[in-house]
């Protein structure tokens, strides 16, 4: 018999229906389920795929550099970052009429172009790139790295170069390599680049390979380092009237702790950033020497973990068994990695706007909005991914005997308490927050706005004051204008930091009031409900009171057969599926809040947010409707402008989003009947019936149809908001 796809599973390949195709796609990356898989091949496949991922990333970033160098206006932007709009790439579209050609020809281009809202211009400028030649050089280098990564991936699948399973499970060596070799050395290299190339570039000195060894980044070179006078590197920083990229007001310091922002660029001082990366490098290089490897020196992670048994006995056997459990489960490791990466990505979103590291990015409002929203959505998907692989660990890899009475087992034993507490928190937040919003809406509707319940976020204001914000009048050390702490801080510790906190030209510690209090708790509701669904899915993955043998059915199952009513929708996959909706919902509230708060801040009418954000109609009318009206009116037979494409995407995103409900609401039986009717008609239609199929057409499983619906919902949701965000921001600020 001829070999049928999928080749990795002959069980699926023998299926006579179209399930063969869909199940083949669904399990293509589930290496553990493939025929003839061994532990060694499993690890080697994953390891090789990492190199493939790196190759894609390098190719993508190379493409960014290449297209900006070829079709962008980087050199013109460098001359005037405030007024030249950065170009991402040209548009060649045969559908464009003359009005569209004129609308999209901007930024000094000769034809239609897309603007760049990714911040790459500001990033490249900050790190010392100045010409198109620099961009081409970077593109070629990254293309080379992409090729090397592909080669490495292929090489590590060859018999001679395949690593052994013991190599993959050598946790101490891997930690040392990642901490010192990757994080430590790369942070040190980046600090070196900033000191040798970027900082001189910010002071009008163009450093490249031809003069790299001739230009000292500091007048005395390594002298202060070798003589122990490290403080000299911080002396004579650039002045407050320094013009970025020129010698005017430039200093000589290379490693400082100034705090605050460069007055012209409104970004962190490059010398502070270099100092930060040097410190990070030092910590990681030391951290990477901690664990016991070749020479028997250092800590054993297993020993440390197993020593953690609280003497009170309330955590049982503590961390015993965890080392082998984690080390032998790639799902556990992936879950930990995704959770960590998700948190970091969300932190990046928060810090990119509040502490901008790239020159002039703070004044590019559309880019600020796009980057914040992008990183928050990415963080959401990564975090929910962590809670997909956690349950898979519990189903496939968890060994109750190995983990008896340790912290992991005790989490499972206490799951009712954990789930019910999360449920209580979600209910409390939901009813109280919605109750306050609805009360305020009713008061507005009845013409008595003075009867709104408006709660000042006193505790949050106190925390801001403790960090040095003086607006609220709290008499605590860093915010008391006469106190010694404030004066000492200004003179000794981060002199620019306290000034930055109290300036209104940045996003540090924004002034907050009752509207912020309410939306904070709405977001808290979303976070707690998302967490409730995800944690419940993980803790019930092996079994529940309703279905004690759930683990025997795997990670996803539609229903577990006749005679067991009520067991649909309770697989761990279903919890992941439900949680993604709540995640999207929550990040919607987060990004709405961030965007509206900043639009009013940038336009100088913060009172609009303060007055309208305390009731739901205010959000619907003064944020969503007011900012989408340009898009709703954006496509007409008579008018074409640079927002027209966003108006089209706004419409298209709604359509994709709505399509999702077709798959989410109509389930398998409906589709099976429809398919059989269509197949019957096809077979009886002349000409059409000349085309036959080998596989009997059957409907998608419930789980697969839910996935199709979820993908449409997510993609449409994000496309809709992306179009709204970019158009409403760029329409106001250019």
From Swiss-Prot:
Pfam families in UniProt: PsaA_PsaB
Residues the record lists as binding chlorophyll a B3: 662, 670
Locations listed in the record: Plastid, Chloroplast thylakoid membrane
Keyword Mitochondrion: no
GO cellular component: chloroplast thylakoid membrane; photosystem I
Gene Ontology biological-process entries: photosynthesis
Cited InterPro entries: PSI_PsaA/B, PSI_PsaA/B_CS, PSI_PsaA/B_sf, PSI_PsaB
Residue runs in coiled coils: none
Binding site for [4Fe-4S] cluster: 559, 568
Enzyme Commission code(s) on record: 1.97.1.12
Cofactor detail note: P700 is a chlorophyll a/chlorophyll a' dimer, A0 is one or more chlorophyll a, A1 is one or both phylloquinones and FX is a shared 4Fe-4S iron-sulfur center.
Main subcellular location: plastid
Superkingdom of source: Eukaryota
Major enzyme class: oxidoreductase
Keyword annotations: 4Fe-4S, Chlorophyll, Chloroplast, Chromophore, Electron transport, Iron, Iron-sulfur, Magnesium, Membrane, Metal-binding, Oxidoreductase, Photosynthesis, Photosystem I, Plastid, Thylakoid, Transmembrane, Transmembrane helix, Transport
Its membrane topology: Multi-pass membrane protein
Role summary: PsaA and PsaB bind P700, the primary electron donor of photosystem I (PSI), as well as the electron acceptors A0, A1 and FX. PSI is a plastocyanin-ferredoxin oxidoreductase, converting photonic excitation into a charge separation, which transfers an electron from the donor P700 chlorophyll pair to the spectroscopically characterized acceptors A0, A1, FX, FA and FB in turn. Oxidized P700 is reduced on the lumenal side of the thylakoid membrane by plastocyanin.
Subunit structure: The PsaA/B heterodimer binds the P700 chlorophyll special pair and subsequent electron acceptors. PSI consists of a core antenna complex that captures photons, and an electron transfer chain that converts photonic excitation into a charge separation. The eukaryotic PSI reaction center is composed of at least 11 subunits.
Protein name listed in UniProt: Photosystem I P700 chlorophyll a apoprotein A2
Taxonomic classification: Eukaryota, Viridiplantae, Streptophyta, Embryophyta, Tracheophyta
């Amino acid at each position: 018999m001829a070999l049928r796809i999928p080749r990795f599973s002959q069980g699926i390949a023998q299926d006579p229906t179209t399930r063969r195709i869909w199940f083949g796609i669904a399990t293509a990356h589930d290496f553990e389920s493939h025929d003839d898989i061994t532990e060694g091949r499993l690890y080697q496949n994953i390891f090789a795929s990492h190199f493939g991922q790196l190759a894609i990333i390098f190719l993508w970033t190379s493409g960014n550099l290449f297209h900006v160098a070829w079709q962008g206006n980087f050199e013109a932007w460098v001359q005037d970052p405030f007024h030249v709009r950065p170009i991402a790439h040209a548009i060649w579209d045969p559908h464009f009429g003359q009005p569209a050609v004129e609308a999209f020809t901007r930024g000094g281009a000769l034809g239609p172009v897309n603007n760049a809202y990714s911040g790459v211009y500001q990033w490249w400028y900050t790190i010392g790139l100045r010409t198109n030649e620099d961009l081409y050089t970077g593109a070629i280098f990254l293309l080379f790295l992409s090729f090397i990564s592909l080669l490495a991936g292929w090489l590590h699948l060859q018999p001679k170069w395949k690593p052994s399973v013991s190599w993959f499970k050598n946790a101490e060596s891997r930690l040392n390599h990642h901490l010192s070799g990757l994080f430590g050395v790369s942070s040190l290299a980046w600090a070196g680049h900033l000191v040798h190339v970027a900082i001189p570039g910010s002071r009008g000195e163009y450093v490249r390979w031809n003069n790299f060894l001739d230009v000292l980044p500091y007048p005395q070179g390594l002298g202060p380092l070798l003589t122990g006078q490290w403080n000299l590197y911080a002396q004579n920083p650039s002045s407050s009237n320094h013009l970025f990229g020129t010698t005017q007001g430039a200093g000589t310091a290379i490693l400082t702790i100034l705090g605050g922002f460069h007055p012209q660029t409104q970004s962190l001082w490059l010398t502070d950033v270099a100092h930060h990366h040097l410190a990070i490098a030092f910590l990681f290089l030391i951290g990477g020497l901690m664990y016991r490897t070749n020479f028997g020196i250092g800590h054993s992670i297993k020993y440390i973990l197993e020593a953690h048994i609280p003497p009170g006995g309330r955590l049982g056997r503590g961390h015993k068994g965890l080392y082998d459990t984690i080390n032998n489960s790639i799902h556990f490791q992936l879950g930990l990695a995704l959770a960590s990466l998700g948190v970091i990505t969300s932190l990046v979103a928060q810090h990119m706007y509040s502490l901008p590291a790239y020159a002039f990015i703070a004044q590019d409002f559309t880019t600020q909005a796009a980057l914040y929203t992008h990183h928050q959505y990415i963080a959401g998907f990564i975090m929910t991914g962590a809670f997909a692989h956690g349950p898979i660990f519990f189903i496939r890899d968890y060994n109750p005997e190995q983990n008896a009475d340790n912290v992991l087992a005790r989490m499972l034993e206490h799951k009712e308490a954990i789930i019910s507490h999360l449920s209580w928190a979600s209910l409390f937040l939901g009813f109280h927050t919605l109750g306050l919003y609805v009360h305020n809406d009713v008061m507005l509707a009845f013409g008595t706005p003075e009867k709104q319940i408006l709660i000042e976020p006193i505790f949050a204001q106190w925390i801001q004051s403790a960090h040095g914000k003086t607006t609220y009048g709290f008499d605590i050390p860093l915010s008391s204008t006469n106190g010694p702490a404030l004066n000492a801080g200004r003179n000794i510790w981060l002199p620019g930091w306290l000034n930055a906190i109290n300036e209104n030209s940045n996003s540090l510690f924004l002034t907050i009031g009752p509207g912020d209090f309410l939306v904070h708790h709405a977001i808290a509701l979303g976070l707690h409900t998302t967490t409730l669904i995800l944690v419940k899915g993980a803790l019930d993955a092996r079994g529940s009171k309703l279905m004690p043998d759930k683990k025997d059915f795997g990670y996803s199952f539609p229903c577990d057969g006749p005679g067991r009513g009520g067991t649909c929708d309770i697989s761990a996959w279903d919890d992941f599926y439900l949680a993604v909706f709540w995640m999207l919902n929550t990040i919607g509230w987060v990004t709405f809040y961030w965007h509206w708060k900043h639009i009013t801040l940038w336009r100088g009418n913060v009172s609009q947010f303060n007055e309208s954000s305390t009731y739901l109609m205010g959000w619907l009318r003064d944020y969503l409707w007011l900012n989408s009206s340009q898009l709703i009116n954006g496509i007409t037979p008579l008018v074409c402008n640079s927002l027209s494409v966003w108006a089209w995407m706004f419409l298209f995103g709604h359509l994709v989003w709505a399509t999702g409900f077709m798959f989410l609401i109509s389930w398998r039986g409906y589709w099976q009947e429809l398919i059989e009717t269509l197949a019957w008609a096809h077979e009886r239609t002349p000409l059409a019936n000349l085309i036959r199929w080998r596989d009997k057409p059957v409907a998608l499983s419930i789980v697969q149809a839910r996935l199709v619906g979820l993908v449409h919902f997510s993609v449409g949701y994000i496309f809709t908001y992306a179009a709204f965000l970019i158009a409403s921001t760029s329409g106001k600020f250019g």
